[in-house]
């Protein structure tokens, strides 16, 4: 049996009353009462946490709520409604953004969720985007964004006993408020326990509150033991009592002492005394575009510097790119990352397209069984037992029927996959960012060097931003308080990043004119290369992979190589033979890759300090805090799947900069940190040779 089996998510088993009230067959309990569900939820959770008054008095930009048990999403939807009303009535209040994290072990199927939410037409404005983005049953965090209302939902699928400890908690805490919901303690005793209460306590910010419908004595005592000051108040309607409380100052102090150092991330928050609203991003591809929009939506002023004469000039400049996840048999951290990032990217592209039209089609992707090695690899992916909505096997006949042309091979079908226009998407995202906030774009500006500003001494210059950076271009220099490099392989040109383990690979994509033989192709084909359906009378066929080759000149031989790969993998078909490559229509880009396929995202570590800091790492049991350059970040190493991963990676980095909950478990976060290979070597007692 595959190691992935224990990571699979099971759906809730629902049966319905005559009044369409959903009941859980597993827990023998009701999700909500159709007559009183809204009033009870508002009374227990919104009023119980005194959110109306707290939002009015709140001085920060974003407020974070966590919930045990997403269920039908009613608590989330009602909170959305309350928050939208609050923003409308208080447009000048500092609070602008709501972050809601919910933990669900047995998510409803989408059809069941649709039925359940039909009860609440007054919540349609929030139900519609929820249903549009509702994920398939995959383990981990699914980030859903309601841009119109400035609300983000992190929907964590899995046992909260596993998922909650996997969250990265800042030293200032993570959540302002907890909804302790779920089925009654008598029905679901496994969830309601002291371990959970302690984890909830450790996630709390200063002044965090908690509310729950139950008044069970062991719940009250468990929360008190975990560091909450608890009280009782009148329960809703006929219920005698319910519990409310807040985190104690003693618990906050004790929780800080329990925090362990991080090998891969700084455990301490950076200086927040001065808001770092001025961000410089270096780059011109999908990573820099997505990050620009993510930071704009958080109120930052962003300046984008691109060394080329246009955006999407490099690897992001192809006419078409395939979109599908990188999966494996174990459905390990890498597979989970790409699966959930893929689902987020789909939603992201559809949302961008609503205001900035982009050519794309989610008509599916086929991975072909073109030789024994590929067949073995694809069969292993199937053994993971992932949902058919994500990946399924097709017979030869089914493959031909769905492709629209003759292939005569089995395939793996990704029904949600497809293709998109990379250059159009990058340009659309940047236009959207300009429409939503303060983004300035500077082309033909190559960053040569940068260093920490020498005047960063608040005692000498109180008006100077703390830990800002001086950026030096060919004809001028400028200062920004925060710097992000989204510079692909050019990252290695900067002294602060010279030791980052990156590789470069040249790739040429052939643009081929359609004809009557190939035009019927309805779906993207992936083999050793790929072939897209026609867009504007043209297909994309690719791509070559020339490791360490930085030459960006057109190559006729690589046109031939792309066609040869297609004919080798799909032999004996007249339609492949009639593809015309006798022209210079192609795009050459340099991919930036990492050895383990994980990208690099996060704060940039100090390499020299790391060698000193971790010289005894092989003997230490507990890690110490890793040394990082202040206010300096990296987003690179996206490889050939940047359009699958970049939107969620940008969200993650913007969330980290803004001290919001992150959309990845620690296992995935650690795997994406820049210093991961350095630390692994040092922990094994091996020297770093750079």
Curated annotation (Swiss-Prot):
Its localization reads: Cytoplasm
What's the Enzyme Commission number for this chain?
2.1.1.61, 1.5.-.-
What does UniProt give as GO cellular component? cytoplasm
Q: Sorted alphabetically, which InterPro entries does this protein's record hold?
A: FAD-dep_OxRdtase (IPR006076), FAD/NAD-bd_sf (IPR036188), MnmC-like_methylTransf (IPR008471), SAM-dependent_MTases_sf (IPR029063), tRNA_MAMT_biosynth_bifunc_MnmC (IPR023032), tRNA_MNMC2 (IPR047785), tRNA_S-uridine_synth_MnmC_C (IPR017610)
Region: tRNA (mnm(5)s(2)U34)-methyltransferase; residue ranges are 1-248
> Needs which cofactor?
FAD
Alphabetically, the GO molecular function entries are: flavin adenine dinucleotide binding; oxidoreductase activity, acting on the CH-NH group of donors; tRNA (5-methylaminomethyl-2-thiouridylate)(34)-methyltransferase activity
Organism's domain of life?
Bacteria
| Chain positions covered by the region annotation FAD-dependent cmnm(5)s(2)U34 oxidoreductase | 282-690
Chief subcellular location equals cytoplasm
Catalytically driven reaction(s): 5-aminomethyl-2-thiouridine(34) in tRNA + S-adenosyl-L-methionine = 5-methylaminomethyl-2-thiouridine(34) in tRNA + S-adenosyl-L-homocysteine + H(+)
GO terms in the biological process aspect are: methylation; tRNA wobble uridine modification
This protein's name: tRNA 5-methylaminomethyl-2-thiouridine biosynthesis bifunctional protein MnmC
What is the organism of origin for this protein? Psychromonas ingrahamii (strain DSM 17664 / CCUG 51855 / 37)
